[in-house]
């Protein structure tokens, strides 16, 4: 009873005095609030990409910014569980018809220069939160088999999807170890799908059997 009253009080307080910083917004999120975030729309003509939440929602945007620029992983405790459930649901049909199927979990990589600049890769943090829920060890974490070998301009600075696709050509490199395996790519946000499409094409060229992608937002 007391806990319910506290939740009601916090809800009223947030309405009267809404949080003004991304940190304050993220700090107030719990499992229930994260589960109730607005769902993302499908990525047009890319049904292999599975985004969770609608990016323009202020809470979703706060999660992304806190993770990407401040390494705030608090929401991943809950988001990792959601991702894992979605992934297992997706691959269950594959396992039914192919018991020998191998599934690689690969975060979208960044270049070494970008890693030095930022200190971490937020996509790796998301992937690791998924692994923490993979108690049956269904997924093999394999970031070493997929690298970004060329820096590319930030998408927001590109004028068109065609230009973005052109900038991305040849920026990834896949290890032959992906041959014959199913790959699940992890990223924070999908906008046009250009980065994920180039990643997928590179993995297919290296022999991946199929490639899916999951993102927090779209």
Q: What does each of the following model-derived ranges do?
A:
Residues 1-218:
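Glycine-rich phosphate/pyrophosphate-handling loop used in enzymes and phosphotransfer proteins
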């Amino acid at each position: 009873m007391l806990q319910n009253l506290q939740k009601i009080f916090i809800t009223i307080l947030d309405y009267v005095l809404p949080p003004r910083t991304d940190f304050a917004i993220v700090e107030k999120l719990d499992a229930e609030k994260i589960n109730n975030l607005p769902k993302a729309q499908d990525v047009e003509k890319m049904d292999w990409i599975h985004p969770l939440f609608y990016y323009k929602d202020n809470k979703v945007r706060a999660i992304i910014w806190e993770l990407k620029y401040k390494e705030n992983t608090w929401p991943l405790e809950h988001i990792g569980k959601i991702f894992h459930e979605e992934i297992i649901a997706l691959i269950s049909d594959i396992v039914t018809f192919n018991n020998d199927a191998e599934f690689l979990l690969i975060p979208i990589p960044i270049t070494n220069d970008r890693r030095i600049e930022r200190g971490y890769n937020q996509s790796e943090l998301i992937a690791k939160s998924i692994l923490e829920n993979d108690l049956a060890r269904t997924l093999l974490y394999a970031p070493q088999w997929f690298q970004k070998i060329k820096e590319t301009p930030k998408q927001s600075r590109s004028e068109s999807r065609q230009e973005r696709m052109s900038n991305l050509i040849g920026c990834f490199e896949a290890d032959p170890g992906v041959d014959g395996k199913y790959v699940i790519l992890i990223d924070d946000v999908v906008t046009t799908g250009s980065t994920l499409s180039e990643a997928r094409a590179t993995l297919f060229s290296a022999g991946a059997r199929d490639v899916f992608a999951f993102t927090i937002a779209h």
